[in-house]
Amino acid sequence: DTNDAITRPSWYTRRHIAPFTLGDTAIDKIIKEATHAVVSWVTKDNKPVSAVMLYRLIDGVITLTSTTNRAKYHAWKRNPNACFCICEPGNMGRQVTLRGTVDIKKDPLLLRKFSEGLLMLQSRGKPVSEARIIEEIAKFDAPDRYMMQLNIEKTLTHDLNRLFEVEATGEDVWTR
């Protein structure tokens, strides 16, 4: 009988989470709309470290900036493996985790694009004058300023809202 409900233990939904992932469109939207990521690296003695960092999407690549007095710079020079976790703005239950490696480079054009992106964020999309862009670049342009870009090797996602919805409704998302 097709009306027979499958009885599963209470913990089943939270153990079998494969249906609670995000599609490519949602992933792209989250990465484009978010402004910050929790970024991770490891210390010399392999201890994990994370920090929330502002990023800009430049030519489709997640881009950050930092100076050589920051731990992440030294960590990623030593071991470029990184993990970035990005949550949907206003909804931490929908998240994208990106694993890959970080390229570190001196690149004035990339710094300019990063600065322009930051100013567009601050102005909420209103045009920014060339003088203001130059002023912003000067704030970033320390002699030891580097640009960092994530080369994505693996993408993991989770949609906690959908999981909660399935728990509440009892919908069977495993035997479709």
PLM features: residue spans?
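Charged, gly/pro-rich active-site loop segments
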Residues: D1-L22, R94-R176
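Short, surface-exposed beta-strand-loop junctions and turns on beta-sheet-rich folds
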Residues: R70-K72, N91, F164-E165
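Short acidic (Asp/Glu) patches
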Residues: T67-R70, N79-C85, S123-E136
